[in-house]
Amino acid sequence: MKVCICGGGNLGHVVAGFIAAQGKHEVSMLTQHPELWSKQLVIDAPEGTSYAGSLSGIFSDARQAVSDADIVLLCLPGYAIRKTLKQIKAFLRPEAAVGSVVSSTGFFFQALELLSSNQVLFGFQRVPFISRVTEYGHRARLMGYKDCLYLAIEHAERPETLRAALADMLQTPIQLLDNYYEVSLSNSNPLLHPARLYDLWGDWQEGQCYSHVPLFYEEWTEHAAQLYLSMDNELQQLLAVLPVRKGSIPTVLDYYESTDAASLARKLRSIEAFKGIKAPMKATENGFVPDFQSRYFTEDFPYGLAIVRRLMQQKNIPSPTINMIYEWGLPFQSQ
């Protein structure tokens, strides 16, 4: 198959290299900076092995990148999805499948609006890998796998064929969900990150500096866990009134095998793949301040949490914790 990866971030590197290294597919990249990429992409895996994948092409031109692709996979932050869909739509083959590596930042809502009504769409509930770029365009770390991935597919005559192809590419079992709501509404990053950000800086004032940068997960507090659980409880009320199969989006406690805020905090502090990840901050001459340009702010509030909040308002479901945290983060979007 011919696969085009759109986006040169952490996930774009690892997904492209992982698929290309298998030697079964032609993998190309659509990126704003093709001149910074090598055709040989090295991926370092958590078990200590490394493997290299050869890219068939690296393009900034959408026509060159997607016109012969069987699968187009967006590995993009929420703010880049609409722009990229508009960029590629005229050059997509009618039978091409267009998808997103994670769907909680509005992929399906935007793709259904912008692309042909017959275009095959797919999207994952959670990212397949935990990924970090080591050397841009050349090397990246695959820091963690998922035991199983959950996928929604729309407009496909044979969804099972696409599911099986993606499972083979990602070397991970994939289960099909009933509809796109089940991947678009997530209690992962869109709730997880804002809960911790509010816990860290809910009382932050302009000009306030900190002496150090805390670890985002390894110092996770019980207060952050309780906020996360409250947001999840509100989301579960929304899911109950949508055409979503019960259990398709497990509760936070079920997913993390926890029983309360204290055990959830312990679990999040202990996850190996999360170790070493620092809170999004930047240095100033007086200390450290929150980095409002980080994807935690630029993606999880306006493209993750906002979708959940808007649907809850449409369904007249109270969401006091989600509202509180969303409204706290809203002023920082302009920064």
Predicted regions and their residues:
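Substrate/ligand-engaging "lid" and interaction regions
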Residues: 134-231
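An anion/phosphate-binding loop that grips the pyrophosphate of nucleotide cofactors and donors
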Residues: 69
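NAD(P)-dependent Rossmann-like dehydrogenase/reductase catalytic/cofactor-binding core
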Residues: 206-212, 218, 225-335
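Short beta-strand/turn micro-motifs composed of small residues
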Residues: 7, 31, 76, 102, ...
